[in-house]
Amino acid sequence: MEKIGNDYHIPVLYYETLDNLVINPDGTYIDCTLGGGSHSEGILERLSDKGLLISIDQDTNAIEYSKKRLEKFGSKWKVFKGNFENIDTIAYMAGVDKVDGILMDIGVSSKQLDDPDRGFSYRYDVKLDMRMNTDQKISAYDVVNTYSEEQLSKIIFEYGEERHARKIAKLIVEERKSSPIEKTSDLITLIKRAYPERASKHPAKKTFQAIRIEVNRELEVLENAMSKAVELLKVGGRLAIITFHSLEDRIVKNKFKDLATACKCPKDIPICVCGGVKKFEIITKKPIIPIDDELKNNNRAHSSKLRILERIFD
């Protein structure tokens, strides 16, 4: 399999995404999650000189890295620093009213995970951080050291799907009474105390995921961004979303199902009285998942799923 990507990030479902998204070479597209620029570069390579790609990222490092890579495409590429939750505002700033396609590659990038200074990974002993946007104030340190036991238990259980959530939250609150929990190693030590001696996966994986999601408001951002994104689509325009865990995928699946349903009447009404018109079609009846070759070459592709929605009526 041909290697796609770079030392910043290896994109998942690369060809599957581009083949299903870029169907008008003269069109206008938005890449909501620029990262290392691999998907953006792939889109740009498929666009004619009449086409336009708008890329968005809240990570300054990602933008600076990708600028060097993509500036060769000239005026058919525009980049904006910001959260894709504000996709409508960014499209307006770019002078765009409607688009032919939008890509959202959800979650943390390989570069962010592998950068010890960012505090995303339990593999490095560093200060708790986990901010995708380093300009924002709240970090993992703040969540761990200021949230109540009830709040911690809730996010660890809901966002990490961690069955030991209550015990972990209790241990965190007890520990910070004597001194702040500052580093990843401090948090990992507490989490391990809540686990049985033999665990098949790293005990901290789910809790770190939960805290990262909370710090960056990932699920809230996804829901808000989807609602705004579909309003930007032309008839025939597509929204492609790549997810990496069940929480994200469930949100996308349910949102697509709701959008592709014509009738919006309450379920207890036996017949449709709203006169709703079907405006969207789900292109992927089942999510597209990586082929074996990709799984062999990119371990982080294992949980990825691609879902695609198309506007069929304005």
Curated annotation (Swiss-Prot):
Keywords: Cytoplasm, Methyltransferase, rRNA processing, S-adenosyl-L-methionine, Transferase. It is an enzyme of class 2 (transferase). GO terms for biological process: rRNA base methylation. Its EC number is 2.1.1.199. Transmembrane segments: none annotated. One of its GO terms (cellular component) is cytoplasm. It is found in: Cytoplasm. PANTHER family: 12S RRNA N4-METHYLCYTIDINE METHYLTRANSFERASE, S-ADENOSYL-METHYLTRANSFERASE MRAW. Specifically methylates the N4 position of cytidine in position 1402 (C1402) of 16S rRNA. Belongs to the methyltransferase superfamily. RsmH family. This is Ribosomal RNA small subunit methyltransferase H. It comes from Fusobacterium nucleatum subsp. nucleatum (strain ATCC 25586 / DSM 15643 / BCRC 10681 / CIP 101130 / JCM 8532 / KCTC 2640 / LMG 13131 / VPI 4355). The gene is rsmH.
